Amino acid sequence: MKSYIFVHQGVSDEIEFALALLGYIVIRLPSFGALGPYVCCHPDSLLFPLPDGRLLMHENYYRENRELFDRTGLRFALTDEPVGAEYPQDVLLNALALRDVLYGRLDSVSKTVKAAYNKHVGVKQGYARCSVLALGERAAVTADRGLEKALLSQGASVLMLPPGGIILRAAAPSGFDEKGKKIKPVGDAVRCDGFIGGSGVMLGEDTCGFFGDITAYKHYEQLQSFARSHGVRLVSLGTGPLEDMGGAVIAGLK
C-alpha cells in the first residue's frame, strides 16, 4: 500500500527524510494564491480528507497543480465555493473531524465537508483543525477555550495548554488571487503564535510526529505525560523550534 503525506512546501529536507524513512511518499504542497501568506501552503487549509477516502480541495487549486495530484492516483473532490485571503474566508477546509463529529466555524466551512458528517459542533475558532492536536480519536490538545469546551461536550479527553512558543512563518503565495490579479510576494515574516495542531501529525495509531524538536517545546513534559496516558509517543521529525506548518494530510492507495 502506498501512503502519501501532503506537507507544507517549506518543510526542511531533514523532515522530508524522516517521513520517507517511515515509509511515506512525501508531497510538498505548492502555495495557493487565493489564501493569505500565513496559510497558503498549509495542508489543513488546502486539503480536507473526506470519510469516503477522497481529498477535498478548491477547484482552482487543483487546476493549478493538476499534474502533481493526478500522478498520485488518489481520488479527489473539488469545490468552487468562495475562498479568500482574509479571515474567515480562508477557513473553508479548516474544520476538525474527530470520532465522526465535525467541529468548526460552521458558517464558513465548506458545504461538502458539512454534508459528510451528521453531527456538527459550532465553535468561534475558524482554524479548528489547526488549533487542535488530535492524539487518536479520543484525546486532543489545544490552547482554545471554545474548542476545549466543545470537545469535552462530546466526551473527548482534552489537555489545555497556554498559547505561544510555536513559530508561524509566512510564505510567498504564487500565481493569481481569486480576482485574477498577480500575487505580490511577501517577506519571510515570522511570528510566535502558531497553533499546536499545525505543529504535528499522527503517524499511525500510536505515534505523533512534530515539525521541529518537540523536547524543546516549553510545555513538553505536560504534553508528553498526557500523550503517554493515551498510548501515544511523541517524536521529533526535525531539529529547531516547533513550527506550525499546517499539520499534514495522509492518504493511501491499496
Where on the chain are the PLM-derived regions?
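Histidine/cysteine-enriched polar flanking segments
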Residues: 1-254
